[in-house]
Amino acid sequence: MTGRTAMRALITGVGGQDGSYLAERLVAEGLEVHALVHPDEPLPERPGVTLHACDVADTARTRALVRDLVPDELYNLAAISSVARSWSEPDLVARVNGLAVAGLLESAWLAQEASGRPVRFVQASSAEIFGAPCRSPQDESTPIRPVNPYGAAKAYAHHLVGVYRERGLHASGLVLYNHESPRRPVQFVTRKITSTVAAIAQGRADVLRLGNLAARRDWGWAPDYVDAMVRSARAGHADDYVVATGESHSVRDLVAVAFAHVGIDDWERFVEVDQALVRPTDAADLVGDSSRIRAALGWCPTATFHDVVTRLVAADLDTWEGS
């Protein structure tokens, strides 16, 4: 391990949106990149990345892998990221989004202690840890009060990051607000909206069914949030950071911008509200104050809300046209 010439990184969740962008960036920077892939999932195409079949919740396997690799940077992006699924499978979400993080943090600390080589840990946390926040916008001092099983598991992991930071691990928790890209799965509301709008524009669909149109979120561009991860890993000291644009928009706003991009202004005639799609407990107005990471690490978003939505619609139009 002491003879390595390149920085080494280990990524969990490489099959997802953020993991794909992160892997591409680190490979381009010349790092030796390794990644975990669940044994039951197909291997993603990640050029330049060494893939390891391993369940992130298998503590013994992950501990052995981290011990053998001793990564300079460890990014934990693996998670079940559906709030809706956390209501139907709360035990699984707790294991993957919470307990698995405990195992990874301990593995990183043990590898660091045994090798004498620092391991820098980045945890992808979520604005859902704030639940129904008592103030808006939220920052790092906002009380953590999750209102769903997903948020609760992420909150547990977020607290653990602080515990291991005090123990001597360079561990940062990034409270990531909603961030999108064409690589976001279509089951998420942003992609559901933009893909359906693109289909309607091409005569392939005639209705968009949604839940709560008034729900508000802080939506950003995924590659910007990956940049925040890398900056936090390489910062002089570890900390927790809210990563957000600072702007709140409703689902209704998103729908309007998406339809406007395809030349449809009277979009209400295409939208149906389905109460079955409303979450049992939906978080209130989630909008983040990212002043700390902007000041400390020089991070700032590069894409506006309008940029994000129109990029998604354009990508979905291309997909439909190519099908």
Regions found by a protein language model. Give the residues of each.
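Conserved NAD(P)H cofactor-binding loop of Rossmann-fold oxidoreductase domains
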Residues: 77-81, 125-126
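N-terminal Rossmann-like NAD(P) cofactor-binding module of classical short-chain dehydrogenase/reductase
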Residues: 73-75, 122
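N-terminal Rossmann NAD(P)H-binding glycine-rich loop of SDR-like oxidoreductase domains
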Residues: 9-29
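Conserved internal alpha-helix within the Rossmann fold of NAD(P)-dependent oxidoreductases
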Residues: 59, 101-104, 229
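Catalytic helix-loop patch of NAD(P)-dependent Rossmann-fold dehydrogenases
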Residues: 88-106, 116-123, 128-173, 180-184
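Conserved Rossmann-fold cofactor-binding substructure of NAD(P)-dependent oxidoreductases
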Residues: 53-73
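Conserved glycine-rich Rossmann-like NAD(P)H-binding loop of the short-chain dehydrogenase/reductase
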Residues: 31-41
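C-terminal substrate-binding subdomain of Rossmann-fold SDR/epimerase-dehydratase oxidoreductases
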Residues: 190-191, 196-323
